[in-house]
């Protein structure tokens, strides 16, 4: 169990010890800690001792020494529920609002237009997921700066990231304007209405991810939840107004674009407020060459972001490849399939929202030498109830449910509802496991996502646009991928605990001869 401000790194391979047969000092301290730790765990469930703040909850008294900008960890289930609660509640509210929006839009547009909207939304999520890779990089870099006592570098580093993102958005705009007609033809869309707006919204997501990453690194989960609510509320209002006004597919894309703009501005304001601590203010240095440690940190950050960029893009592909390929192969059935797709993929959106809590928790606790298994358990607990409820509906009353929610004309793919719900339950676990393992710096899990994505493209293509066959193909892929992620999770933690046990009992590697 490492100190809160310790520099990230694996446990030592050897232990300082006395003479033969004598326990080392580090082993003695470990044994004392194992006796004292349960007292801290039991005290955590008692009344909090803190300072009452008007209009807010009790603020716990800080530990004696905490690195500037670094929030201390509480590794109890109760603390995990309290931290994840606001994000989970916001995710539920936004998903409910999204479900109501889906119902309203389905009744305002034709079946064909509804399928086109589903394709554009799928494209948005595929292209916005790499923006989430920036979020992973922000969380990992900022937590490293906090842990090393260099929180004063955070603002300067983030300002540079913002400038790079703005340039990238400008380049994206030029490319999208040049390729919008080709993209529309490839998707089988009748025109390019909404393509530019939906792709630019995905680009703006990059900026939004930077500031949400700052909120996560600061563990400002209530602010993060408020930002999720703002994004969902603006999206619901704008889409309803534009689609009801007769703008159709283009109106839907405009609503998404406006909601991302507003959410980005709001997140930027929240992040600036969260990091207003003078301890994080930039310090003017004397210039000169960067030290080797900083260059090493930058290379490590680039590797983390690159892996997350690929991995999260593949998660977006896995979430939407079925509806995109079905729309391309059999456009007449994309509307009914989009109905079961939207209904079942609410689980994945919930997992993505909870991943916003799990990623920084895993990153910070792993850097401290611990783990976030309890926090993962909390997120799975939050997902379990809606998953079981939706699966029950999909198994026992699929057609009445789809008819009630979407209308009879979009209920013809009811037989594919249950396998698709099971597939999305598996993908939800994969999303959470990916966020967790990226937090531990396990970049190699991208290989699992590459294999799963390739298999998904092959099997969904072989389904030839049939809704039932497409859903079962998706289930096979997602189940195999979830199993692989679970195995990777166990392997990483067995290895991690093995290093801890080696250190705890004074085992050491024999020197090479």
Regions found by a protein language model. Give the residues of each.
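Alpha-helical transmembrane segments of multi-pass membrane transport and lipid-handling proteins
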Residues: 62, 159-187, 237, 241, ...
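Helix-loop junctions and terminal segments of transmembrane helices
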Residues: 132-148, 217, 340, 344-368, ...
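Membrane-interface junctions at transmembrane-helix termini in multi-pass inner-membrane proteins
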Residues: 205-226, 364, 422-448
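N-terminal membrane topogenesis motif
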Residues: 1-97, 267-271, 288-308, 488-513
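Signature of the first transmembrane helix
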Residues: 45, 58-64, 76-136, 306-329
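Hydrophobic alpha-helical transmembrane segments
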Residues: 192-197, 225-277, 468-493
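Membrane-water interface segments that mark the loop-to-transmembrane alpha-helix transition
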Residues: 79-94, 98, 120, 132-181, ...
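Interfacial segments at transmembrane-helix termini and the short loops linking adjacent helices
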Residues: 111, 180-198, 331-334, 395-425
